[in-house]
Amino acid sequence: MASALTAALLVVAGQRSAGAQQPTWSTEHVDESLRPELDAITARGRLLAEYDLAAWHGTDAVMELRPDQSRMGGYLARRREDGLWEVVFGRLDGEGNDYLIAYRAVQRRAGDTVYTAATLSPREHDAGWYARAARALDIGKNAFGPVNRPYNTVVIPASDDGDWFVYLMPAPTQPGVFPLGGDARYRVSRDGRTLLQYRRLHNTILEVRQTPQPGATIKAGYHTAVLDDRPEDTDVFHVLSREPKVPEYIASKSYFFRVEVDGRITAYRQR
């Protein structure tokens, strides 16, 4: 049965833009022993997608203010306790202790893509969440090193103990093309000053073009997991962010995974 499943997946891989048939598996192949781990990956991937969407629309709102680029610096985003996303623009002070916020954009309602932006003059000094996140981001960017294409960055809480996850992911450079791969995740201490763990998520960058041939319909995407036996947080982000919305099949050493368009992951045993 494993060989039949493999063949079905290869059909998807070879015809991702030509109306490929999705493989069908019975429930006997589902492995729910991975459910807690997969649900955690889904949760992080969904948070990455929300962060990216907030950064996009928050930036648009701030740009309408015609901001002073010398005050902009970088950006950070977070989902507040009231459920609304907030995006701030600024930079760390010379000592790296305070984050100086020059502009802020706040989501009007939960789930909304409209943000209200404001200029902060004088700049707001934050020595807490944003300062720690900014230091963690600098740690991750420095560890990742120089890049030869645009990259997006995300900083999210890693756990209740206050550590950070810093992600670097290639940004789209062409309409309708969604890059997958060439990304990394760093775990940084609560104060944002110490690198604790490095995780390479994917090696090469796949430029996924979601434009089907005339008369064809895209049914799913496909790629192999080389570095680990599990999907990555950014696999979920990729599915949630690209258009059109289609599932992604991932083949690892021991499993086939299906990432649904809502980010939920199902594991199927290969043997």
Name each region found by the language model.
Residues 2-13:
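Bacterial N-terminal signal peptides
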Residues 184-201, 214-217, 222:
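Gly/Pro-enriched, hydrophobic low-complexity segments
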Residues 176, 180-184, 188, 196-199, ...:
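Charge-rich, low-complexity terminal tails
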Residues 12-21:
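Signal peptide processing junction and immediate N-terminal pro/mature segment
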Residues 146-188:
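Hydrophobic, aromatic-enriched interface-forming segments
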Residues 93-94, 122, 198-207:
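Short, solvent-exposed aromatic-acidic interface loops
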Residues 21-117, 128-161, 206-271:
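Active-site-proximal loop/helix of nucleotide/amide-processing enzymes and allied scaffolds
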Residues 99-116, 178-196:
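A short, surface-exposed beta-strand/turn
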